Curated annotation (Swiss-Prot):
Designated name of the protein: Chaperone Ric-8
Species of origin: Drosophila melanogaster (Fruit fly)
Keyword Phosphoprotein: yes
Tissue expression notes: Expression in the embryo is primarily neural.
GO molecular function: G-protein alpha-subunit binding; guanyl-nucleotide exchange factor activity
Presence of the UniProt keyword Cytoplasm in the record: yes
Length: 573
């Protein structure tokens, strides 16, 4: 900026200020490197000149342009750290109308409505709303760049003011609501004290849940509203990451929140647009912070379940009741969206999201960790509720029919999860293994049936069940879930349990060699394995009494230990 222009800004020459600021803002709209502004103390002088205009109410018509300039200057982290800007931050808080002062936020949304009826406030004009939004943008930059600014915002109780504005019945422009949420997100993400105050002192989760519920109650939700909802969900994720409230109080809030998130999943679950998908993504991230006992709110008893039960009883009186369900039979549905008289549309949305994520991950080679939130939620659902586990098992592990291919081959959900069992990515591997194991009711034999022993060996080793012993301490319903189809039973004897499929018959290469040659090749193999062991490449192991692999001193120990181990296993069975 030219010296003459800077002097006119300092002198507050109103006739020249608009043109000067317009030229500066246009020229530096994408500026990120401020080396030229640090010579001759230009950054600091321009900063003071702009705030001189912002402090002058007679020049309020220029405040929007000035705040655009401030937003550009707040990108310079070095200058923010080396200059004392506390007074300027207070000015921005005042312009954004989030300086709380003696503000006291009511404990509940209902009390806030009562207060608004007793003391109605004037709605800001369009010009004032633009100034507020621009000031919030500047504060977002400052909060992101400077820890001192974050602490100053907390001292000025800006959390109280933002939450009160968000929860008020007064309608605000979308831009203002969006940057309110953006500022809250940055504060709660970067300042642990902000999370605690918002959750405990201000009862913020209750206010934000109510606001989210109100947003979902609107007839139409445009793109701007979807952006606001995404930011709100991100704030709620931060707040619920480390709950500090008492377990009972937090569970009550979580139950209500889960119910609202269920409605959100149902509304945007078609995943028709990228924005819909973004909303569902943030909702799933938030669900990972909810305890499993509260996730039962994702499914509700169907409205016509009682009527259907009455009809079923009448039908059962007219005909004999079957003693055994047919192979692969599905529970009767009371409507197209229900399973065992519970509405499971939200679970269907989660599975649809998982399928789309898997397809996107394969097409774009994106990070495996993008799948971990939805898998985490599915594991919690399967563990927390019998009906949800039954539905997920029906969708992920349907009755086996074609066992000619390995479990990891194919594009079904089971195939994808089986492939993940042997990934080096630990988080995704462990989540996939746990989901499959829970859907199998932690039954080792059933897990081998659906995944093959080779794919599940890592899980078995981790849990100490390599010897296929029964898992102790499991608490699952005892209802029969025998889902073997006729096709599976016909091929069952030919299934290789290690591979998890029928192994094609082929001529053995050992048939054409003599016994002496077989013995020679066997010793050669032993020697090669011993060389690998000595080089630290492999570690031969036996399964110890705890069901975990135990390294061997020498490969020949297998000859001594295996017969005894097999004998012990027969005695157990």
């Amino acid at each position: 900026m030219e010296t003459e222009h800077l002097k006119r800004l300092e002198a507050k020459e109103a006739d020249h200020i608009p043109a000067i600021l317009d030229e500066f803002n246009t020229k530096n709209a994408d500026l990120l490197v401020f080396d030229s502004f640090r010579t001759d103390n230009l950054w600091h002088e321009l900063w003071l000149a702009i705030f001189g205009i912002l402090d002058d109410q007679r020049l309020s018509h220029l405040h929007t342009q000035c705040l655009n300039t401030v937003r550009i200057l707040t990108r310079d982290e070095f200058s923010l750290q080396t200059n004392y800007i506390e007074q300027e931050v207070n000015t921005l808080l005042k312009l954004a109308r989030i300086e709380a002062g003696s503000l006291k936020l009511p404990a509940t949304p209902d009390e806030l409505k009562q207060e608004e009826r007793e003391e109605p406030q004037l709605e800001p004009s369009q010009a004032q709303s633009e100034v507020i939004a621009e000031a919030l943008k500047c504060l977002c930059n400052l909060v992101y760049q400077s820890s001192d600014c974050r602490r100053q915002c907390l001292r000025q109780h800006c959390l109280d003011a933002i939450l009160k504005r968000v929860a008020s019945s007064m309608r605000h422009p979308c831009a203002l609501e969006y940057y309110d949420m953006k500022l809250l997100f940055l504060l709660t993400a970067l300042e642990p004290a902000a999370r605690s105050r918002l959750q405990i002192d201000l009862n913020g989760l209750t206010y934000m849940t109510k606001w989210l519920d109100d947003k979902l109650g609107e007839d139409s939700v445009g793109e701007e509203q979807l952006n606001i909802i995404c930011e709100l969900l991100k704030v709620m994720f931060n707040v619920t990451s480390a709950p500090d409230k008492s377990p009972n109080e937090y569970e009550i809030q979580s139950l209500h929140l889960t119910g609202v998130l269920r409605e959100l999943l149902l509304r945007f679950g078609d995943l028709a647009t990228e924005k819909d998908r973004a909303v569902v993504t943030h909702a799933i991230n938030l669900l990972t912070n909810i305890s499993g006992s509260c996730l039962t709110e994702l499914t509700l008893r169907c409205s016509n379940a009682e009527l259907e039960s009455h009809k079923e009883r009448e039908q059962d009186n007219e005909k004999e009741k079957d003693t055994e369900a047919g192979a692969g039979a599905k529970p009767r549905e009371c409507c197209s969206q229900c399973f065992e008289k519970r509405n499971v549309r939200s679970l269907d949305v989660l599975l649809r999201y998982l399928r789309q994520s898997l397809a996107q991950q394969e097409a774009e080679a994106s990070s495996h960790e993008l799948l971990s939130p939805v898998l985490t939620v599915l594991v919690k659902c399967a563990r927390s509720d019998r009906v949800m586990r039954h539905y997920l098992r029906q969708e992920i592990l349907p009755p086996l029919r074609d066992v000619s291919q390995r479990p990891e081959v194919g594009q079904e959900l089971r195939n994808h999860l089986c492939r993940f069992l042997t990934l080096p990515a630990m988080i995704l591997r462990d989540l996939s293994a746990e989901l499959l194991f829970v859907l199998c009711k932690e039954n080792v034999g059933r897990m081998i049936k659906y995944t093959g022993y080779g794919n599940a060996a890592g899980l078995f080793a981790k849990r100490g069940i390599l010897d296929c012993r029964r898992v102790e301490g499991t608490d699952y319903s005892s209802d029969s879930e025998d889902s073997d189809t006729e096709e599976y039973k016909q091929q069952q004897q030919g299934i290789n349990p290690v591979l998890g499929c029928v192994e094609p018959r082929s001529k053995s290469h050992l048939d054409d060699i003599s016994e002496e040659q077989k013995e020679y090749e066997a010793m050669q193999l032993v020697n090669l394995i011993e060389q690998l062991r000595q080089g630290g490449i492999v570690k031969p192991a036996m399964i110890d009494k705890d069901g975990r692999p135990q390294p061997l001193e020498h490969i020949l120990q297998l000859q001594e230990e295996l017969p005894q181990q097999q004998l012990d296993q027969k005695r157990k069975t």
